[in-house]
Structures are given as structure tokens and as C-alpha cells.
Amino acid sequence: MAALVKPMLPLATFGGQQNGCLQHQLAKLVQARARRGYEHDIGQLAEKLKKRQVARGHLGDVLEQMGRQSELLPELVKNDEEFRIVQQRDLGHNTIEYLNLLQHDKLFSCRLCYTHAHWLWCEFHKTHAYRGPRDISVDAYVDHLNSDMGVVALVEEYYHWLSSCNDKAEAKRALKTLANVESLGDLLDSYNYSSVDADTSSYELMDFE
């Protein structure tokens, strides 16, 4: 009885599979390195706020719970037909701590970040803020949404637009995207945390060229 021998893959196909596997592994290594860099950098940013004696809130704690309960970015997840956006997520410790402080700092320390004057941005936001097209067919945007920075950016954008002289209406868009809520006060109240001044800005940015 003749033994069954599995035919060998053509060399071109085998080589292509190896290259594809290698590229995938390299991409994962790059992503892991970026995550470590982000976690370190946002930890440093949180430490700067602590040194300025910024009060610690509970916004990070709330968003961390919502992430575990698959309640973040609800509209984007709902319209994601290819299931590319993660539903359940665990925010990193440094991200949670920064968001707790951001509730009271209100982006004051980085108030020139998110303006069109990118040369005035701090190093953290120059490195980690997403500035590409907001289209879920774009891989880089999906990667951003699936990262902790995707959550942080929406809260920062909320405070940025809240401080804007002419574009305060954009602030609600950021919160709708983040958690489908009208205000951070409502969000904090729903988790029985103090929401005093959660939706106020301590400064106002004038439009400039």
C-alpha cells in the first residue's frame, strides 16, 4: 500500500508565508514597545500633576469600570461591522491615575496641546496623540481607539473644546463618543462619586493663527 505523502508547498508560497508571519511578529513587537513607552510617559505626566498638588478625582476609576463592563465607545462599537474595536478593556494603572488627576487639572497643564499650534505641544502629546484621519477603515485609527490613549484623548478633547472660545459644542461630541453621555458630572453621579466642577473649565483659549 502506497504511503500518503503530503505535497510540499511551492517555494514561493512557503517563502510568502514566512515573510507574512515575520511581519506580523515584528508588528506585535513594535506595538508592545509603543505600549511600554506610553505607560511610562503617562506615568511621568501623572507625576508632574501630583507635584503641582492637583487633587485626585475618580474619573479614571469610573472609566476603568466601564471598560471592564464593555461600556466605552458604544456608538463606534455598535457601527463596527468588522468587530475591530475592542469592547472589553482593562485600562492601565498609570492611565487610571492620570484620568483621576485630569478630572481636576482639566488639561490646564497641557492647554496648548490639541490646538493647531503643534509646535507648542508637550512631548507626551507630540508622541502619543493621534492626528490622522478618523475613519475606522484606517488601521492606525483602530489601533488608537483600542489603546488606553484612545480613551484618554477623548477626555482631553472634551476639556480642550470646553475651554474653547468658539467651539464648545464640540465638547459634547467627545463625550458622546466616549460613553454616550451629556456630561462628566452625570457619569460620575451614576457611580456615586462627587461631580463638583467636573464640567467646568478653569481657563479659556482664544482662537489664534
Curated annotation (Swiss-Prot):
InterPro entries in the record: Protein_Ac34
Pfam families associated with the record: DUF1247
Name by which UniProt lists this protein: Uncharacterized 24.0 kDa protein
Originating organism: Orgyia pseudotsugata multicapsid polyhedrosis virus (OpMNPV)
